[in-house]
C-alpha cells in the first residue's frame, strides 16, 4: 500500500463504443483479476487479464470467442464483463459491454458499468443475487506521497485476504464475481462514485483512513464440483457478514484482530458511507479512573485480642510509692538462682495488679502484651526511676550471690543434639563415635587405634566393634601396606588385612607395673610370634555393668607374655590418602598415642564418670570422627586448628629412663607426672613428625632386646576433666564381653588365632 499513486487520467475510455446497455437487473458481473507481471514492477507495466470461468467451461461457453482472449491492459485497469443469464438464452454478453475502469492504486473495489446514468466512468453496483460480502476496513498508514490535509485516504480492496494486488480470485482461474443481497438493501454506489472521483487528485472523505476489503467466506467460490445450474444463474449458497476490522495502526497492536459488525444500508446518490462502529483513534477518549486506595490495617503482633482499657489505670507509679516489699532472691526446686529484675520487670510488677483489676476478662498473656505496649509508650524520663531501681536490685543480687553467672535453663531452649556415642564405659576410655550417617568417611588409614580396658587388675586388650568403626588389637609386624582400620558409613567395617599370612603380634605388650615409681618391667617371654588374623572378640554388655571404681590408680595391667621378634619394622607416618611405601626397619619403635580427647562440649565443667587409664597406640594417622561442635571438624586430629586439637609431645626413652609428655588442649597446659630419674636422650634417636602435630621420638639403647614400654602413670587429677565425657546413648546396642582368664588361657586363645 506504500506505492505512489500514478498520474490519474481525467476520463475513462472504453475499449469499444458502448452499445445500448442491457438492463442490469438479474445480471451478475464478472471481474477479471489483474496482477502485475513478475517483470520489474513499474507503474506502466502491462498486466494480462485472462477471462475464464471459475468452474471450468460452464460459464465461458456462453461467451463469444472474442471475449476469451488476452487483453493488454495497464496495472490500474480491470476488465469487467457481464455474466450471461442462462445457457439457453440467445442474448449473450457481447465484448462491447466489457469496460476497463480507471482507478487509483489505493482503491480496489471495481463495480460494473451503471445502467442508470449511462456514463461508463460512473459505475454502480446493484445487488441482484442473494449474496453477502465481507467488508474489511483496514487502517492504512500515510505514505510519503499522501497529503493528510486533504482528508482520510482509503481504498477498497476485493478478494479473499488480498492486500497487495487487485485480485478477485476463486479456487479456479483468476476470476470472481460479486454477489448482492436478495433484499436489495446493500447499496454501495456512492462508494464507487467517490472512488472514481479520485482522478482529480482528491480521495473520498467518507473512507476514513481505511481500506474496505471485500472478502467472500471460506466456501464462497466453489470448485469445479459445482454443476452448470449454479454456474449459470450465479448462485452460490453461503452466508457472510459484514465485518469492520481495524488494524494495529488505529487501536494498537492488540486490536489487530478486532472485528466489529457493520450494517450497510441503501443510501441516496449524494450521501456518503458512515462507519458505524468504533470511532477513529483520535476520537477515542480514555478517562483515567483514580483507584481509591483501600487502607490496609496491619494488626500488630503485640496487640492483645481483647481490648484492654487503660484509661483509669495509673502507669507511672514510682517504685518508692508502690509499697511493694523486697522479696529475697529465691531458688527454684532445682536450686536455680533467679535473675535480678530489669527495669521493665520492676515497672510491670508495680502496674500489673492495677491493669488486671481494670480488665477482669483478660488473661495473663493479654495483660503482659498490654504492659509491653504501655512500657514502649513511656518516655525515657518516665522510665528512669525504674532503671535506677533495677540497678539497685542488681547490686543487691551481686552481693548475695557473688560468683553468680546467668545460665539459661537447658529445658527452655533447643540445643544442638549430641550424637556422640561412647564406645567404652565404666573404667574404660571413651572413644568418640557418631552415628553411621555422620561418620566422616576417612579412607584407608594406615594403622588402627588400640585402647585397652582396665576393669580388673588383670585385664585383656579390648577390641571394639561399633556400627561405624572397628578397633582391632593386632598390629602390623612387617612394613608392607596393610589396612587394619577402615570405617564404613553404611555398615560395620571389617578389618581388612591385605596379606592374611602376615605375622602379627599383639599391640599391647605383656607388662606389669605397680605404680608411677615402679620401673621394673617384666620382659616378654614366649615361644615365638603368633599369627593373628582377626582381633579377639570382646564386648561390653552395658554401661551399668561396670562400676566407676577408684582402683584405676592401683590397677595392674597384665597380658599374656609373648616373645616379640628381635627387630621391629616401623613405617613413617605419611599423608592419609597416600599409600604406605616400604620403609627401612627402625630398631626401636617406642611409639605411643596421645590420649583420645573426649567430646569438646564436655571438656570443662563436667564431673568425671570414668577414671583415666593408659592408652596404647600404633603409628600412623588416627581417626577422630566428626561431631556437632564447630571446632571439631572431621577428622578431628587433622588440620592446623589452633587451640582446638591436642598437641602431644612425648619423650620416650629406655625402660630405666624418665618418661615425660606435655599435653595442651584448648589453651590449657597439662603435663605428665615427673619422675625422679633424670631424662637422657640417646644419640641414635629418630623422630618423625605426624600430620596432626604429634611428634614421636624413637630412641633405643645399645641393648639387643627392645621392649614396648607403657605410658607412665599420668596426673589423673589434671587430666580427668579433659579426657572424660558422659556416656550418651549409642545409636545401637554395643556389647563387649570381658572374659577374665589366666595367662595360659589367653596364650591358648592367641595361639588358636
Swiss-Prot record:
GO terms for biological process, alphabetical: negative regulation of transcription by RNA polymerase II; negative regulation of Wnt signaling pathway; positive regulation of transcription by RNA polymerase II; proacrosomal vesicle fusion; spermatid development
UniProt feature, compositional bias: Polar residues: 531-540, 726-739
GO cellular component, one term: chromocenter
Region described as Disordered: 1-45, 140-161, 514-540, 726-753
Compositionally biased intervals (Pro residues): 7-22
GO function terms (MF aspect): DNA-binding transcription activator activity, RNA polymerase II-specific; DNA-binding transcription repressor activity, RNA polymerase II-specific; sequence-specific double-stranded DNA binding
DNA-binding feature ranges: 337-405
Keywords: Activator, Cytoplasm, DNA-binding, Nucleus, Repressor, Transcription, Transcription regulation
Pfam families in the cross-refs: HMG_box
Main location: nucleus
Cellular location(s): Nucleus; Cytoplasm
Described purpose of this protein according to its UniProt entry: Acts both as a transcriptional activator and a repressor. Binds to the DNA sequence 5'-ACAAT-3' and shows a preference for guanine residues surrounding this core motif. Binds to its own promoter and activates its own transcription. Required to activate the expression of postmeiotic genes involved in spermiogenesis. Binds to the promoter region of CTNNB1 and represses its transcription which leads to inhibition of Wnt signaling. Also inhibits Wnt signaling by binding to the CTNNB1 protein, preventing interaction of CTNNB1 with TCF7L2/TCF4.
Subunit structure: Interacts with CTNNB1, competitively inhibiting CTNNB1-TCF7L2/TCF4 interaction.
Name of the molecule in the record: Transcription factor SOX-30
Amino acid at each position: 500500500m506504500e506505492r505512489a499513486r500514478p498520474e490519474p487520467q481525467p476520463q475513462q475510455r472504453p475499449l469499444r463504443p458502448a452499445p445500448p446497455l442491457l438492463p442490469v437487473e438479474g445480471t451478475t458481473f464478472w471481474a477479471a483479476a489483474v496482477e502485475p507481471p513478475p517483470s520489474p514492477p513499474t507503474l506502466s507495466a502491462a498486466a494480462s487479464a485472462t477471462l475464464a470461468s471459475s468452474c471450468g467451461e460452464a460459464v465461458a461457453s456462453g461467451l463469444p470467442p472474442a471475449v476469451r482472449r488476452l487483453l493488454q491492459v495497464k496495472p490500474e485497469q480491470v476488465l469487467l464483463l457481464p455474466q450471461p443469464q442462462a445457457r439457453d438464452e440467445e442474448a449473450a454478453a457481447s465484448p462491447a459491454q466489457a469496460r476497463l475502469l480507471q482507478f487509483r492504486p489505493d482503491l480496489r473495489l471495481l463495480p460494473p458499468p451503471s445502467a442508470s446514468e449511462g456514463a461508463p466512468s460512473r459505475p454502480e453496483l446493484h445487488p441482484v443475487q442473494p449474496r453477502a460480502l465481507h467488508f474489511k476496513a483496514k487502517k492504512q498508514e500515510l505514505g510519503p506521497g499522501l497529503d493528510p490535509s486533504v482528508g482520510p485516504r482509503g481504498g477498497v480492496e476485493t478478494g479473499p485476504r488480498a492486500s497487495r494486488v487487485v485480485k478477485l480470485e476463486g479456487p479456479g482461474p483468476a476470476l470472481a464475481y460479486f454477489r448482492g443481497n436478495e433484499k436489495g438493501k446493500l447499496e454501495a454506489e456512492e462508494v464507487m462514485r467517490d472512488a472514481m472521483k479520485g482522478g482529480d487528485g482528491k480521495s473520498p472523505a467518507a473512507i476514513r483512513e481505511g481500506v474496505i476489503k471485500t472478502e467472500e467466506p471460506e466456501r464462497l467460490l466453489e470448485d469445479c464440483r459445482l454443476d452448470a445450474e449454479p454456474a449459470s444463474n450465479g448462485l452460490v449458497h453461503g452466508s457472510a457478514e459484514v465485518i469492520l476490522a481495524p488494524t494495529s495502526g488505529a487501536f494498537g497492536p492488540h486490536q489487530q484482530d478486532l472485528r466489529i459488525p457493520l450494517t450497510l444500508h441503501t443510501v441516496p446518490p449524494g450521501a456518503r458511507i458512515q462507519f458505524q462502529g468504533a470511532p477513529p483513534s483520535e476520537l477515542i477518549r480514555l478517562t483515567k479512573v483514580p483507584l481509591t486506595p483501600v487502607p490496609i490495617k496491619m494488626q500488630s503482633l503485640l496487640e492483645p485480642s481483647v481490648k484492654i482499657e487503660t484509661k483509669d489505670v495509673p502507669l507511672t507509679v514510682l517504685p518508692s510509692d508502690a509499697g511493694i516489699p523486697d522479696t529475697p532472691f529465691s531458688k527454684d526446686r532445682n536450686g536455680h538462682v533467679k535473675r535480678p529484675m530489669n527495669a521493665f520487670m520492676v515497672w510491670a510488677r508495680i502496674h500489673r495488679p492495677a491493669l488486671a483489676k481494670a480488665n477482669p476478662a483478660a488473661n495473663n498473656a493479654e495483660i503482659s502484651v498490654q504492659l509491653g505496649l504501655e512500657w514502649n509508650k513511656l518516655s525515657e524520663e518516665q522510665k528512669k526511676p525504674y532503671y535506677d531501681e533495677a540497678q539497685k536490685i542488681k547490686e543487691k543480687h551481686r552481693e548475695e550471690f557473688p560468683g553468680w553467672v546467668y545460665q539459661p535453663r537447658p529445658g527452655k531452649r533447643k540445643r544442638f543434639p549430641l550424637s556422640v556415642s561412647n564406645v567404652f564405659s565404666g573404667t574404660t576410655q571413651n572413644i568418640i563415635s557418631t552415628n553411621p550417617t555422620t561418620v566422616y568417611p576417612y579412607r584407608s588409614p594406615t594403622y588402627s587405634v588400640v585402647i585397652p580396658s582396665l576393669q580388673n587388675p588383670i585385664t585383656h586388650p579390648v577390641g571394639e566393634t561399633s556400627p561405624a568403626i572397628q578397633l582391632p588389637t593386632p598390629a602390623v609386624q612387617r612394613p608392607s601396606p596393610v589396612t587394619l582400620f577402615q570405617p564404613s558409613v553404611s555398615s560395620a567395617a571389617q578389618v581388612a588385612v591385605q596379606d592374611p599370612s602376615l605375622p602379627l603380634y599383639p599391640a599391647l605388650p605383656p607388662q606389669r607395673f605397680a605404680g608411677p615409681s615402679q620401673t621394673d618391667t617384666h620382659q616378654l617371654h614366649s615361644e615365638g610370634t603368633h599369627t593373628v588374623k582377626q582381633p579377639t572378640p570382646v564386648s561390653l554388655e552395658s554401661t551399668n555393668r561396670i562400676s566407676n571404681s577408684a582402683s584405676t590408680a592401683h590397677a595392674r595391667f597384665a597380658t599374656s607374655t609373648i616373645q616379640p621378634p628381635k627387630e621391629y619394622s616401623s613405617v613413617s607416618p605419611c599423608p592419609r590418602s597416600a599409600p604406605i611405601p616400604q620403609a627401612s626397619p627402625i630398631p626401636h619403635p617406642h611409639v605411643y598415642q596421645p590420649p583420645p580427647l573426649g567430646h569438646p562440649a564436655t571438656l570443662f565443667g563436667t564431673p568425671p564418670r570414668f577414671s583415666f587409664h593408659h592408652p596404647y597406640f600404633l603409628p600412623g594417622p588416627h581417626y577422630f570422627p566428626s561431631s556437632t561442635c564447630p571446632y571439631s571438624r572431621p577428622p578431628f586430629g587433622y588440620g592446623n586448628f589452633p587451640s582446638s586439637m591436642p598437641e602431644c609431645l612425648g619423650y620416650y626413652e629406655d625402660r630405666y629412663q624418665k618418661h615425660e609428655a606435655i599435653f595442651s588442649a584448648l589453651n590449657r597446659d597439662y603435663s605428665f607426672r615427673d619422675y625422679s630419674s633424670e631424662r637422657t636422650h640417646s644419640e641414635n634417636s629418630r623422630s618423625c613428625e605426624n600430620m596432626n602435630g604429634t611428634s614421636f621420638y624413637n630412641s633405643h639403647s645399645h641393648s639387643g632386646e627392645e621392649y614396648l614400654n607403657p605410658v607412665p602413670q599420668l596426673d589423673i587429677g589434671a587430666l580427668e576433666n579433659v579426657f572424660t565425657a558422659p556416656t550418651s546413648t549409642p545409636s545401637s546396642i554395643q556389647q563387649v564381653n570381658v572374659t577374665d582368664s589366666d595367662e595360659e588361657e589367653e596364650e591358648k586363645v592367641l595361639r588358636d588365632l
